[in-house]
Structures are given as C-alpha cells and as structure tokens.
Design a protein with these regions (language model features):
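Metabolite-binding pocket within alpha/beta catalytic cores that recognizes anionic/polar moieties
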Residues: 2-142
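Flexible, glycine/charged-enriched surface loops at secondary-structure junctions
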Residues: 44-50, 151-159, 253-255
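A C-terminal functional module that forms or caps the active site or interfaces directly
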Residues: 173-216
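Active-site rim beta-loop-alpha module in soluble metabolic enzymes
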Residues: 134-182
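Generic non-transmembrane alpha-helical segments
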Residues: 143-153, 197, 241, 245-253
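Short acidic/glycine-rich loop or secondary-structure boundary segments that cap or lie
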Residues: 102-104, 120-122, 166-172, 196-197, ...
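Generic structural signal for well-ordered, non-membrane alpha-helical segments
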Residues: 27-28, 32-35, 71-78, 133, ...
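His/Asp/Glu-rich mid-to-C-terminal helical/loop segments that flank catalytic regions of hydrolases
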Residues: 218-255
Length: 255
C-alpha cells in the first residue's frame, strides 16, 4: 500500500483526512483489520491515514473510487468518524458490521440489511430530539438487497436493527425479548448513530450486518456473554461475504 502525501491540505482533527484523499463513496467497518481486508479487495489502494482505531484507505473497485474506514466499537467514537468523513466529502456512507440476531430463523452467517435502527445508542439524543428517526436511505437499502439476492445460498432479511450503547448487561438487565417481539432483527452498536448523522447532514446511508450469534440460544444456555464466540469459520466467512456485498453496493449506487 502506498502512503498519501497531501501536505498542503487541512486534515480533519481525529482521523487526519484530507478531502482530496476521500471518495464520495465510503464503506465503514468497526475493526481496522476488517478495513484492511476490504482494502485488499480493491485496486490502486492508498493508505490515507491510521490514527487510533481509525484506519482509512482509498482505492478502486470495478473502476470506481471507494474509501473504506474503520470507526472502532461504540457510537461515541463512531460518530466522530462519520462526521469527519462527511467533512472530507463523503456523500454516501454504508456501515458493514457484526450483530446478534433476535430472530431464530437467522443464525450465524445470515445477513441483515437495515431499513432503520432503534436509537438506544447513548449518543444521538444530544444531537437531536428522540422523535427524529434513524433511517437508512431507500436507494441504499435497494442496492444492498439487489446484491444479496444474487448471492447463492444466502439467508438474509431486511428490517429494523437495535443500536445499543453498551455490550455487557448491568443490574438493569436488557429488553431483548421486547425488541424481538416487536420484530427487530438484531442488535449492534453504531447504525442509529450513522443514520441520524447522515440524515441531519444530508447524505445517503445504509447498513448491512453479519450475524455472529443468536442472542437467545446463548442466554438459554445460562452462559450469557461467556458463550459468545464470534471467531468461528462460519462467522469469518460471513464477514467476508458481507464486505464484498457492501463494497459492490457502494460502488454501483448513483450519488
């Protein structure tokens, strides 16, 4: 990977991004290693910046310029990434990440395309009142669905996700059963933050998620978080497929 040198431009404060280095089409992931994996699927890749958990690359996919960036875990840090990517010129941001499934039909390796997200993120209430919806762009949902439908043997669904601000439960417990009964597909930690920021900043957005556990099977076993094993082959292969699908959708959408 080549390292970019644009000394004359002003970089953003946290991610160190310069507008000339960023494509309007951006794919974001939590894990810096996953960002590097996505970069390996592209050509003519330039390492834009690597600061803290934020690793950013720009390259081409099927001849289209795309940027991939990692945002770490949780809505607070991710919000800084989304804001700075928009400052640097992003017009489309898609998040690809892992999730827990609330629906028994969708187990490890299944994919969810988000139409929106429940705002339990702990971040967006300070940006705009809770009545403001966290929704994906219709065009982005359609593009992700179209690519998913071409994947042989893929079990996927489209619907609402739950974004939570924390991973481990405390004395208050959780409301997983309620959200499952309400038809929420699964739980993750950043989507609603992206959707709200994209909405108020006026860009297109979306999210696709690979199931790395079925929430209720591990809770019924009485092991709780100790039964969480996200590094199995079926999950790793699902992550790779998710990244390929997201990259194709980002590269083919009209802006």
């Amino acid at each position: 990977l080549k390292h970019s040198t644009m000394a004359d431009e002003q970089a953003t404060g946290i991610m160190k991004l310069k507008p000339s280095q960023i494509s309007p089409r951006v794919l974001t992931v939590g894990d810096p290693a996953r960002a590097a994996y996505v970069a390996s699927l592209m050509k003519d890749v330039v390492t834009v910046a690597q600061n803290r958990e934020y690793h950013t690359y720009t390259g081409t996919y099927n001849g289209v310029k795309v940027t991939v960036a990692s945002h770490g875990v949780g809505g607070g840090g991710a919000s800084m990434a989304f804001e700075e990517l928009i400052m640097a010129g992003a017009k489309l941001i898609v998040r690809a990440g892992t999730c827990g499934s609330f629906q028994s039909k969708y187990r490890e390796g299944s994919l969810f395309v988000a139409t929106g997200a429940v705002r339990n993120d702990g971040v967006t209430d300070r940006l705009i009142p809770p009545a403001y919806p966290a929704t994906a762009s219709g065009e982005t949902v359609a593009a992700l669905q179209k690519v998913c439908e071409k994947e042989e043997g893929l079990n996927f669904s489209t619907g609402v996700m739950l974004t939570e601000g924390g991973f481990y439960d405390g004395p208050l417990g959780n409301q997983h059963q309620m959200w499952a009964k309400a038809g929420v597909l699964g739980i993750e930690m950043e989507a609603s933050v992206l959707f709200v920021i994209a909405g108020i900043r006026g860009i297109k957005t979306g999210g696709i998620f690979n199931v790395d556990n079925y929430i209720f099977s591990r809770l019924e076993e009485g092991e709780g978080a100790a039964a969480y094993h996200p590094h199995r082959d079926i999950v790793i292969k699902g992550n790779e497929r998710m990244c390929r699908i997201a990259l194709e959708a980002v590269a083919t959408m009209e802006l």
